[in-house]
Every structure is written in C-alpha cells, then in structure tokens.
C-alpha cells in the first residue's frame, strides 16, 4: 500500500476502517473467551477520551496528571498492603516485569546475573532475559502446577539476582506459594518479584469473599515488587499495566535523566518515554468510582461463573479439567484437542489452546448466556 498523496474524506476513511475490522471479534459479542482483557468500563472510556492528549513522558507539562499517577500508585499500594509504594502505570505486564528484572540486575554486583522463575512464568521474562543479559533459571512445577519451592531453593547460586513467583498464571490462573517463596527470599537475601498482572485485581477481592487463596502481596516481607495490570480485571483501557516497588531504591536504580523536555528535565524509570496520561486518569477514575466493594462484586460474579462452568465441564464426555480453578480461569482438555479448537473457532469463539488445553477466562464481559451457548457448541463438537 502506497502513502496517499491526496487524503480521503473523513466519512470514507471511517467506512474503510469499518470494512477492514469486520472480521475482528468484539468483547460486546461475548464470544471472546480466551482473553485476559475486557471491554473497558464506560467511565474509563469517557475519561480516557477527554484526556487523550496528556503525556506523562513530559510530566512538567501535566503536573495534575502526574499527581493523579502518584495517587493511583498510593491506592494500588494500599490494596497490596503497602503503606508507601513506588511505581508507575506502564504499557502492560510485559514492561512491568522487565522493569522489575532491570531493577534487580542494576542493584546487584553480579557479573553473570541469573533469575529463578517457574516454568509457568509469562513469556515477557524471556524478553527481559534477552534484553538485560540475565540468564533465566527455570524451576520445576508441582503436580498442581504451582512452582516447586524446593527446586527454587536448589537453584539459588551466588549469581542469583532475584526470584519470581506468579499470582495468576496465564494458562491456569494458578497462584504460587508466595509465602514460602517470600521466606526463601528473606533467608537468602534475594529480592522476590510477584507477577500478579492478572491476579492483582482478583485475589484481594476473592479473599474478602471467602475464597481460600495464599497471600501474595507486600504483607509478605520478602516481596519487593509486584506487577499488577488495571487493564485486565481492573477494566481500564489498554494500555494500563502497573509496577509497584516496596522501596524507592528500585526506581532510582532504573531511572535515567531526560534533560530536554518542554516541562523541564526529569528522571524517567519507565521503558517508554512518551506515556499516555489518559490511561492513568482512567485508572484513577475507576478506583474512585468502583471502590473495593465495586471490584469485589465484579470478581464475585466472575468467580461464581467460573465455578459453575468447571462443574459443567465435568459432566461432558471426552472433556476434563486440567485442575480445579483457583481464580476466574478454567482450563480443560479434550480428545482431539486441535480439531475441537478449530471447530469452536470456526463457530466464532475466541478461545486459546494453551500448552495442550483450552483456556476460558471469565472476564467481566463474559455472561452466563454466552457460556451456555459455548457449552452447547462444545458438546456438539465432541459428539
């Protein structure tokens, strides 16, 4: 496609976009079942649109938006049982995880740094390892798909700069034994990073509802940083990931001076320079509007629906759960999995076959009616 010399009327451009996006699945259809993102909350869309010109890459021009980000980090830190946290709203969990690894590396004096992480960890750590020159040391999983803490300990060496635990794995929504990892980290004087990109906006509310889940946050003294994504169960617009550090030294270790900005020179810790302030304002608006009780109701509905679905899967011939769900993610296997996946996708379902199983993520846009329709199609495909 050539760069056009003469532009088209606005109406024609919109018409072309509508035509090109016809094949896209939409959250409003209810048929996207394999995504950890969802349709943003109406308030978030309104706020994001109004403040779309704000750039936190140059915070001196937007001091009000910078203050809002500080308050967002304060509120998220409070949710995570930390009185004074230090961090940013970033592009997503990938950037947040890379920042954590970079901070651990920069504060170490190791020539050949190593990071110990579960085999269930997100692929963003592979990017972090390649970009930062950090060797990834993969820890084995237990039969229940949580990380084997004994194997983590066995792999600690003089080169270990950090340990990673997962609070809501991508494939199964499993929460590692973070308390045990925290104790281990303290015993060896090694920082622990918790990737709660998904679970961060689920676990605090699920625990309040009575679900038995391990502690995962700054209540545990070994935890030094947490990834938490408002654009997942927080219902914020993309991009809105989050990174929170226990101590300011971690942010300082990854900050570089940007001396030429219109709003004045500033120390910048994020990977991206230009950064959408609209995302930050939308997150602030949602936390203020929904509050703990509002998010708890969202999580309650998702957890109940996921438990009902898990029981329905158990009733279907030639389908079985990989494990009982911990969060609002249910994964199951079938006979002829690839064929089943193709058939379901041909019927319009946005699912993912992850490591040999189909994963259903019960996000706020997923309804009981659509899940009943999915189960009907699944039974037909398996019959």
From Swiss-Prot:
Optimum temperature is higher than 97 degrees Celsius with glutamate as substrate. Pathway: Cofactor biosynthesis; coenzyme A biosynthesis. The keyword Lyase applies. It catalyses: L-aspartate + H(+) = beta-alanine + CO2; L-glutamate + H(+) = 4-aminobutanoate + CO2; L-cysteate + H(+) = taurine + CO2; 3-sulfino-L-alanine + H(+) = hypotaurine + CO2. SUPFAM superfamilies: PLP-dependent transferases. The modification N6-(pyridoxal phosphate)lysine is found at residue 232. GO terms for molecular function: aspartate 1-decarboxylase activity; glutamate decarboxylase activity; pyridoxal phosphate binding; sulfinoalanine decarboxylase activity. Pfam families: Pyridoxal_deC. Keywords: Decarboxylase, Lyase, Pyridoxal phosphate. HAMAP family: MfnA_decarbox. Catalyzes the decarboxylation of L-aspartate to produce beta-alanine, and the decarboxylation of L-glutamate to produce 4-aminobutanoate. Can also use cysteate and, to a lesser extent, cysteine sulfite (3-sulfino-L-alanine), but not L-tyrosine. Specific activities toward L-aspartate and cysteate are higher than toward L-glutamate. This is L-aspartate/L-glutamate decarboxylase. The lineage of its organism: Archaea, Methanobacteriati, Methanobacteriota, Thermococci, Thermococcales.
């Amino acid at each position: 496609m050539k760069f056009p010399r003469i532009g088209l009327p606005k109406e024609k451009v919109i018409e072309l976009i509508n035509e090109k996006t016809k094949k896209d699945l939409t959250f409003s259809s209810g048929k996207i079942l394999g995504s950890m993102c969802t349709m943003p909350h109406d308030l978030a869309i309104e706020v994001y649109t109004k403040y779309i010109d704000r750039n936190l890459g140059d915070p001196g021009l937007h001091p009000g938006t910078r203050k809002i980000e500080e308050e967002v980090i304060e509120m998220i830190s409070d949710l995570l049982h930390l009185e004074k946290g230090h961090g940013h709203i970033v592009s997503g969990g990938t950037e947040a995880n890379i920042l954590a690894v970079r901070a651990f590396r920069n504060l170490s004096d190791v020539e050949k740094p190593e990071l110990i992480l579960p085999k269930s960890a997100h692929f963003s750590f592979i990017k972090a390892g390649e970009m930062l020159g950090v060797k990834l040391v993969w820890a084995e999983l237990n039969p229940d798909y949580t990380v084997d803490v004994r194997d983590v300990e066995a792999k600690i060496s003089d080169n270990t700069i950090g340990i990673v635990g997962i609070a809501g794995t991508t494939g199964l929504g499993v929460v590692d034994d973070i308390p045990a990892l925290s104790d281990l980290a303290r015993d060896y004087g090694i920082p622990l990073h918790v990737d709660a990109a998904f679970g961060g906006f689920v676990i605090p509310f699920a625990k309040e509802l009575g679900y038995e889940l391990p502690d995962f946050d700054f209540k545990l003294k070994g935890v030094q940083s947490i990834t938490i994504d408002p654009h997942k169960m927080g219902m914020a617009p993309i991009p809105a990931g989050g990174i929170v550090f226990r101590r300011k030294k971690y942010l300082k270790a990854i900050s570089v001076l940007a001396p030429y900005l219109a709003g004045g020179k500033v120390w910048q810790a994020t990977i991206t320079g230009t950064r959408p302030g609209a995302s930050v304002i939308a997150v602030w608006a949602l936390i203020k509007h929904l509050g703990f009780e509002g998010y708890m109701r969202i999580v309650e509905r998702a957890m109940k629906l996921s438990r009902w679905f898990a029981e329905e899967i158990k009733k279907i011939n030639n389908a079985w759960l990989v494990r009982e769900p911990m969060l609002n993610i249910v994964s199951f296997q079938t006979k002829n999995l690839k064929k089943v996946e193709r058939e379901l996708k041909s019927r319009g379902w946005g699912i993912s076959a992850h490591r040999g199983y189909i994963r259903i993520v019960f996000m706020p846009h997923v309804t009981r009616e659509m899940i009943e329709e999915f189960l009907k199609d699944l039974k037909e495909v398996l019959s």
